[in-house]
Amino acid sequence: MSNKAVIIDGVRSPIGTKGSPMIGMRSDEIAGQVIKGLLERNEKLDVNLIEDVSLGCAFPEGPTGMLVARGASILAGIPETAAANVINRYCGSAMTSLHMISSAIEAGDIEVGIAGGVEDMFTIPQGGFAPDFNVKLAEQDYYISMGEGAELLADELNISREEQEEFSFSSHEKAVAAREAGKFDNEIVPITLEDGTIIDQDSGPRNPDKEKIKSLNPAFRADGTVTAATSSPFSIGASAMLITSENFANKHGLKIRAFIEGRAVAGVNWKMFGSGPVPATKKALEKTGLSIDDIDALELN
């Protein structure tokens, strides 16, 4: 009998950016449609056996407030017997939901759960609806912006504007090529708007123009290196993964997509938050007895 946590399936909505028809749609509705889509493509799972639903959210306010994971679960048709929670670790929130559900499975607390995330950067203002800063923390630059943090990291590691722009250009090229080749189709749950419009493609990736990228002004410092072309866009969307124990999957005829071999978290100086994945990755590799050379694909949230 194995309590090892396994991934059965994972899906997401299209990611909406500026100009997307998804803007204005309630994020709990988006998350509900995503979870419902996940369940519909895993018909062998009895939804009455789902024990917990965990969604990560950086700003659980407004439509993403009021325990959005519970609301999304109800909209998806999950029975009221399933619990729900919302986790905030900013950009790592959804990943932390995966940590929580898989840890609960391995501890024997539950056998099946859903982990994911939801965010609406258009309805929720930067900093939230009512930011309230602690002066003692403000004096230590605790509330540093993502843009300024990126500038500090670029300074520390001598990452030039040219290197950032080349990476951004390559990233958009790859994303557009993958989208056109249908590489994302299997992971996207089409979202239906109130007027019946169906959205099934990301709006963020675009055919990049090197000259336009070079012409942009720095976004966060007058003499900075980070521009709109090398920054993350405002986004709206949701994701969900079906996680079970290995024993549960085998017992119920669920195809295992991946085994969760290990987890780790690590802290760094808050002004250098962008470097956090480095010590966390080192810890995860050490705990699992792997080296970076054993890894074929890396993804950072």
Mark where each language-model region is:
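Cysteine-centered functional microenvironments
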Residues: G16, S54-G56, A82-T96, L153-R161, ...
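Flexible glycine-/small-residue-enriched beta->alpha junction loops
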Residues: E106-L157
